[in-house]
Every structure is written in structure tokens, then in C-alpha cells.
């Protein structure tokens, strides 16, 4: 048999829509310092998931919590056979925690959501219905976002639209990580070799049939957000660099604009009789050149750093313990 080309990712064919009425639904929830809300999250999940008509499992991933989150998850798993708890060896970040849960999930369909209840679990049955009707990805699209400042709403909206414009494939806007994906989509994403991941762009990259499920995002049920303005800025930079080469290509645009400015400054210098004005124009152009060069070097440096990290070959996460499955292992690791 002729081997498949190396750039083709093998994964199972997705089932026909008629075969999706039953099966196993996995819900993956990354957790970091969610002690105050995790019991309420679990209660709402177990109340709403039977409405889907599917068997289900809930996969909690403790991402190096420093509070009592892990103890609460252990207590939940002890009383519920449908719960799996994956404890990472340290805090690897939300994207790594979601990827760890996605790799461990066994469902025919997999829902990814956060533990803070801003994305209401009551939307999940509608996502399942869309999947049963033939969608391979049913992603939550936010109609309203309660409890957030106008500044955050504006900056998030602008970033989502800029990000979508820079992607070479269709990218939904006004969305987060709240989505249902088919087993075939999960297999395709899990098979990707890169270790630093941004699932919001990897799932659309995989293709398949996507449908939005509109909902109103709720205020955080308890606790505080784990994303400071600095972390949000870092996430935005990571998402762009990990998902697109557009930032490097934009340096060509900057170079062209700088050339135009330089020509204009040269023209001013040639026609002006005021020495002070000529000196000021030259100084401004030199400062602009230095700024653009520094920015270009910084952008290239970001890509070099990420290439270096990929070349190191380290796993994206390390699992310390797994609770709730007979095949639980200690000290395992997995490269995403």
C-alpha cells in the first residue's frame, strides 16, 4: 500500500449526522484556583447534561491550583463515577490545560468550557442538537458580555476582528473557548505536532462544518479573573505569532511607509531654506527608522523564540495524577 503523504493528518471519518443521537459526550474544564466556584459549576453541569440524551463524562484539569481546587475536585470525583480529574504537575497555562483535557477526553463529541460559569452550561444541549444535525463544530458566539468594562469590550471586539482579518482561513469573531467539537475534529487537532498551542485558531484551521450558537455571557460566578491586563496582552501576542505569519509580513508595509516618509523628508530638506527645519526633519526620520527597525527585530525575535521552544521538544504539559479511571497513571506526560 502506498504510504500517505506526510502532510496529511490521519484521523477517523466523522460519523453521519444520523449516528449522533447517542454516544458519549465529554466536557473538558481547565481549572486554576477555582475553589470558590467549582462545586456550583459541577452542580449545574450534572443538572443539565442529562438533557442531551447522551452518556457523559466530565474531565476536570487542575492546572497547578494554589488554593483548595484540587481537594474539591478529588471530593467530586470520589462521589461521581462520571468525573475524571487530571492533575498537572504545575501551572502550564490555560491552553495547555485545555489541550491535556482534549487529549484525555473519550467522547464522540467534546465540549470545552471554563469553570467560572461565565459560559452557562445550559447552552450545551443546544450545541449538542446542532452537532446531531450535522455540525462538526458548534461554537458559542457571544451576544452580550455582562460584568465587563466598556474598554475591555471594545478592545476585545477590535482584536477579534483584526485577528480574523489576518488569518488565512475563516475565523469566527466574538467567541472564546466555549465550543463543542466532533471526535474527528479533536483527533485532527490532537495529531498536530506543535507544542505551544492556541486552540481558538487550531480548531478553525482544521476545517469541517462550523455553526454558531448565540448566547449571553454571564458575570463571573465567584472569585477573580486570572487574566491581568499584562496576561491578556501576552495572550494576544501569542495568539498572533502562533497562528499567523502576518506580523512579519507587515514589516514590509512598514518598510514601504518608511521609504515614503524618507522621500518626503528628503524633498523637504532639498527645498527648505530653514536649517532648523531641515535638522528637525532629519532627526524625526532617523527616530522613525530606529523605531521601525527595533519593532521589526522584536517581531522576528518572537518567531525565533517560539521556533527554539518547539525545537526543544519538551511536552506541553506533565500529568502528576489522574483520578476516576481504571487506567489512571502517575507521573505520565504528553506532548500536545
Where are these regions (language model features)?
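Hydrophobic helical membrane-anchoring modules
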Residues: 2-21, 198-336
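Structured catalytic core of nucleotide-sugar glycosyltransferases
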Residues: 2-149
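Short conserved micro-motifs on helix faces and helix-strand junctions that flank
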Residues: 30, 88-90, 179, 252, ...
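Generic recognition of well-ordered alpha-helical segments
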Residues: 40-43, 47, 71, 157-160, ...
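Conserved amphipathic alpha-helical interaction elements at protein-protein interfaces in regulatory
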Residues: 47, 51, 75, 79, ...
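Acceptor/aglycone-binding surface of glycosyltransferases and processive sugar-polymer synthases
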Residues: 86-90, 94-104, 118-199, 218-237
Amino acid at each position: 500500500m502506498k504510504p500517505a503523504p506526510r502532510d496529511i493528518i490521519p484521523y477517523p471519518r466523522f460519523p453521519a449526522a444520523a449516528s449522533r443521537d447517542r454516544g458519549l459526550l465529554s466536557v473538558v474544564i481547565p481549572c486554576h484556583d477555582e475553589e470558590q466556584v467549582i462545586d456550583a459549576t459541577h452542580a449545574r453541569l450534572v443538572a443539565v447534561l442529562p438533557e442531551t440524551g447522551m452518556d457523559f463524562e466530565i474531565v476536570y484539569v487542575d492546572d497547578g491550583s494554589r488554593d483548595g481546587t484540587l481537594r474539591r475536585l478529588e471530593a467530586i470525583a470520589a462521589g461521581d463515577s462520571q468525573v475524571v480529574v487530571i492533575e498537572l504537575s504545575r501551572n502550564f497555562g490555560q491552553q495547555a490545560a485545555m489541550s491535556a483535557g482534549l487529549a484525555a477526553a473519550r467522547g464522540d463529541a467534546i465540549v470545552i468550557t471554563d469553570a467560572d460559569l461565565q459560559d452557562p452550561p445550559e447552552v450545551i444541549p443546544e450545541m449538542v442538537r446542532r452537532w446531531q444535525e450535522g455540525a462538526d463544530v458548534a461554537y458559542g458566539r457571544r451576544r452580550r458580555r455582562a460584568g465587563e468594562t466598556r474598554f475591555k469590550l471594545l478592545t476585545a471586539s477590535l482584536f477579534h476582528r483584526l485577528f480574523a482579518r489576518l488569518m488565512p482561513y475563516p475565523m469566527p469573531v466574538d467567541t472564546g473557548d466555549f465550543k463543542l467539537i466532533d471526535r474527528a475534529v479533536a483527533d485532527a487537532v490532537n495529531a498536530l505536532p506543535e507544542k505551544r498551542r492556541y486552540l481558538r485558531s487550531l480548531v478553525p484551521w482544521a476545517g469541517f462544518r462550523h455553526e454558531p450558537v448565540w448566547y449571553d455571557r454571564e458575570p463571573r460566578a465567584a472569585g477573580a479573573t486570572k487574566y491581568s491586563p499584562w496576561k491578556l496582552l501576552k495572550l494576544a501576542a501569542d495568539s498572533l505569532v502562533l497562528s499567523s505569519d502576518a506580523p512579519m509580513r507587515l514589516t514590509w508595509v512598514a518598510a514601504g511607509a518608511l521609504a515614503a516618509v524618507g522621500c518626503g523628508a528628503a524633498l523637504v530638506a532639498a527645498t527648505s531654506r530653514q536649517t532648523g527645519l531641515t535638522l528637525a526633519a532629519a532627526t524625526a526620520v532617523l527616530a522613525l527608522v530606529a523605531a521601525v527597525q527595533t519593532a521589526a527585530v522584536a517581531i522576528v525575535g518572537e518567531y525565533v523564540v517560539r521556533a527554539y521552544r518547539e525545537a526543544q521538544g519538551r511536552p506541553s504539559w506533565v500529568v502528576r495524577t489522574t483520578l476516576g479511571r481504571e487506567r489512571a497513571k502517575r507521573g505520565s506526560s504528553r506532548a500536545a
